[in-house]
Amino acid sequence: MNKLSRQNKIKQIIRSKHIGTQEELKHQLELEKVFVTQATLSRDMRELGLFKSRDKEGYLYYEIPENGSTIFTPAALYYIKKVFRTDALLVFHTNLGEADVLANLIDSESHSEILGTVAGADTLLVICKNEEIASQLESDVLSNL
């Protein structure tokens, strides 16, 4: 199973059940015939931006963040260190080796405002539909850094 399919399965499980630990999530994935290492699961959870909430009985469980003022997930924002814009293009700077991870996160969300991404080692080019969208996304990212 590829990464995108696996992460979509994780989202499906998190949305349908109260999962309180990584071990519970790993078990639910195995019931779905998806086998992952603890390291892979941990990385997927970080990239998806999962966070813990408490229900009325005080039980902690994982949730998927809802996008607020930006289309980018908390996981994507985690990787962005600097942002620059020119016309309809955004340039995101990341730590070395993280630009491709950020590209995968952005591409997997399939936002209509973004035409595509091109990743280097620590730089990501984001091609937006137009200059207005690029400007708005730049502002959103800057306000969330």
Swiss-Prot record:
Residues annotated as coiled-coil are: none
Give the CC-aspect GO terms: cytoplasm
* Presence of keyword Membrane: no
Which residues are listed as membrane-spanning? none
A single GO BP annotation from the record? protein complex oligomerization
Cross-referenced HAMAP family: Arg_repressor
Can you say what this protein is called?
A: Arginine repressor
